[in-house]
């Protein structure tokens, strides 16, 4: 398309030496590409790009390429014929015409409709949707205004006064107002202002400071005075012991319920008192030996050493009392008779235990030995009847406490 450009000018005269050979440049840098300018545009941004491209292309100067080889020297008075002889042989080269630089102002660019009527009818216009406002935040309006003042617009961004954007903005504002009105209607009470919150906060701080001050005053009153000659310790090291008045301990009585046969006995008892007191009380109440008293809680036999606290007894709990039958040892003991033997003198009295099946001769011999009257002839009488010593207490119907008289 383009050929290398010829010489740009002659060298200065005055020296007889020949011209210096210049370095040959590559044809790619020495050629100019044809730049087509689209005069039909619907935005000013494309015009600016074309202008900048043209300016960048003009800054690159194309250096002429000269054929290698020495060039004949020329005198100051050389003529046209001499200059023609000095040129190298070969076909003459046509100089490339330099194109005129075309600079278009944004205001001078003609506005030509790009689309025909059919194309406009088939275009899908931007819908009036509020979701598009997210793609066009409010901060971009300032950028659009700045671009409008400088005459540049972002590619693909709508114009500042586009009707669809203003319509979306107005719709968004209306919906926000509606939601705010609904929120105010739904809320029974408006939220407290930050001023009221700060007042509440200051009141709470004042109350806390008053409480702390009172506690410090109380601590200063209760803390003992430090002894003289000793350094006062820090507040953190102080230990205050407050001893209250010693009150006499009042034992708490626990009403224990005891069921025996058809009777229900209520016995006040301390929680730490053993159940032996219950056994003694029931033995006295029933007129039997304490060894024959058995306490049961449900089906569990209770030990006399246990306490209501260890057994975890409550007010509604009832203890059963059972009277056991007499044991064989008790039967034998009951068969023993306590008989009194009385002599002439008051001091000659002796109490002797004798079995019902034992003869009375044993009692007589025991009395003679105890009183030192062995060898003497003594007579023993029971209810006016003289005893020979071969009788049995059971045959005579004797009981414990009966009296036998001695004469001699």
From Swiss-Prot:
InterPro entries xrefs: NFATC2-Int_DNA_Repair, Rad60/SUMO-like_dom, Ubiquitin-like_dom, Ubiquitin-like_domsf
Keyword NAD: no
Entry-linked PROSITE patterns: UBIQUITIN_2
Coiled coil feature spans: 197-220
Mod. after translation: Methylation at the N-terminus by PRMT1 modulates interaction with the NFAT complex and results in augmented cytokine production.
Membrane-crossing residue ranges in chain numbering: none
Cross-link (Glycyl lysine isopeptide (Lys-Gly) (interchain with G-Cter in SUMO2)): 118, 120
Cellular localization per UniProt: Nucleus; Cytoplasm
UniProt-annotated stretches for the region Disordered: 1-113, 141-205
Pfam families: Rad60-SLD (PF11976)
Keywords from the UniProt entry: Coiled coil, Cytoplasm, Isopeptide bond, Methylation, Nucleus, Phosphoprotein, Ubl conjugation
Biased composition (Basic residues): 196-205
Compositional bias segments (type: Low complexity): 24-40
Keyword Coiled coil in record: yes
PTM annotation (Phosphoserine): residues: 41, 43, 73, 77, 79, 81, 116, 187, 190, 193, 209, 303, 358, 379
Function: In T-helper 2 (Th2) cells, regulates the magnitude of NFAT-driven transcription of a specific subset of cytokine genes, including IL3, IL4, IL5 and IL13, but not IL2. Recruits PRMT1 to the IL4 promoter; this leads to enhancement of histone H4 'Arg-3'-methylation and facilitates subsequent histone acetylation at the IL4 locus, thus promotes robust cytokine expression. Down-regulates formation of poly-SUMO chains by UBE2I/UBC9.
Protein name: NFATC2-interacting protein
């Amino acid at each position: 398309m383009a050929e290398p450009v010829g010489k740009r000018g002659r060298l200065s005269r005055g020296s007889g030496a020949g011209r210096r050979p210049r370095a040959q440049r590559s044809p790619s840098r020495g050629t100019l590409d044809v730049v087509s300018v689209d005069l039909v545009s619907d935005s000013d941004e494309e015009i600016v790009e074309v202008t900048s491209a043209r300016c960048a292309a003009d800054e690159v100067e194309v250096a002429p390429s000269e054929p290698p080889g020495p060039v004949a020297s020329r005198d100051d008075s050389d003529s046209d014929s001499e200059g023609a002889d000095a040129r190298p042989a070969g076909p003459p080269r046509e100089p490339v015409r330099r194109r005129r630089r075309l600079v278009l102002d944004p205001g001078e660019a003609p506005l030509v409709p790009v689309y025909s009527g059919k194309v406009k009818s088939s275009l899908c216009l931007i819908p009036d949707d509020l979701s598009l406002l997210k793609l066009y935040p409010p901060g971009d309006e300032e950028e659009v205004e700045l671009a409008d003042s400088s005459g540049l617009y972002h590619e693909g961004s709508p114009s500042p006064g586009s009707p669809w954007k203003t319509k979306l903005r107005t719709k968004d504002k209306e919906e926000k107002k509606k939601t705010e009105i609904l929120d105010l209607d739904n809320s029974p009470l408006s939220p407290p202002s930050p001023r009221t919150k700060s007042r509440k906060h200051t009141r709470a701080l004042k109350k806390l400071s008053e409480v702390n001050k009172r506690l410090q005053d109380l601590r200063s009153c209760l803390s003992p005075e430090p002894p003289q000659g000793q350094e006062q310790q820090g507040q953190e090291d102080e230990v205050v012991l407050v001893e209250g008045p010693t009150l006499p301990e009042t034992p708490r009585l626990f009403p224990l319920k005891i069921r025996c046969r058809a009777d229900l006995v209520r016995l006040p008892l301390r929680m730490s008192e053993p159940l032996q007191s219950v056994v003694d009380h029931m033995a006295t109440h029933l007129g039997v030996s304490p060894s024959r008293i058995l306490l049961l809680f449900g089906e569990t036999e209770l030990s006399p050493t246990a306490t209501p606290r260890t057994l975890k007894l409550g007010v509604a709990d009832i203890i059963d009392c059972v009277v056991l039958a007499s044991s064989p040892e008790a039967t034998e003991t009951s068969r023993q008779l306590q008989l009194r033997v009385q002599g002439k003198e008051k001091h000659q009295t002796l109490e002797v235990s004798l079995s019902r099946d034992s003869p009375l001769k044993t009692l007589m011999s025991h009395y003679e030995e105890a009183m030192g009257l062995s060898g003497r002839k003594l007579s023993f009488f029971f209810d006016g009847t003289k005893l020979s010593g071969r009788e049995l207490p059971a045959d005579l119907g004797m009981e414990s406490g009966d009296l036998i008289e001695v004469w001699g």
